Amino acid sequence: MKKYLNKTPEEVIKLVTIEIIERAIKLGRKNNRTISISKTSGGKGTNVEKLNPKTEIGKEQLEKFFSSIRRHYTFSGLGSPEEKNSINWRILNLPFTRRLLVVFQVALSFVLKGTPFKNKLYRWMGIHVGRGAEIMQLVWLDHFRPELIFIGENTLMGAFTRLTVHAYEGSGKFRYGLIEIGNNCKIGAGTGMGPIRIEDNVRTLPGATLSPYFSNIKNGSIVGWNPPNVKESKE
């Protein structure tokens, strides 16, 4: 996972998306399917063949596609599981060997308490973990694409917290995005979140659900209650 080190969130999601585009082209040709990528969850997609980084025209179109980096992308056209030429979204995402390795790493980290070794393990997986961060036991950090998760310095992740960077939407369609948690945050036990940006000094109450209700939590906010709401800092 070294190629994701010292990269900004925007650089990482661009790298990840190019990797998936290349796999989509290969699998689409093999299974005779047209796969598209969209910058929105429901918008009209672009045929991945037009974004082939191995051709000159494709490189140009790819740079235009990334002229503005989005925080999430959607792939469609994989087909339903019952179709003979359908493509499993898990196979599109990662090769089998890496999927197996990441699942093993997640299983091991799942039972470890907040220790320096655990942080090193997460970094080895590709997760960006800041200095002084504490990740308690039974925290679920999505193994779909661990490198899309950024946890700031001196941030506490309470037990049973769930971070999910992807969503499978059925009918051969899935999306993924970035999760960014700032510095000095306290994420309460059992908090659940999808792609989101959380600024510094944010506190979530136990059991809070942050996505899809919010896409950005401002500095110093307190998030919780049912239904969820945000109490912003007066500073």
Q: Language model features by range: what are they?
A:
Residues 1-126, 220, 226-235:
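Terminal amphipathic alpha-helical/low-complexity segments used for targeting or macromolecular assembly
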Residues 2-14, 18-23, 80, 159, ...:
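Glycine-rich hexapeptide-repeat left-handed beta-helix
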Residues 105-180, 190-196, 210-211, 215-216:
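Left-handed beta-helix
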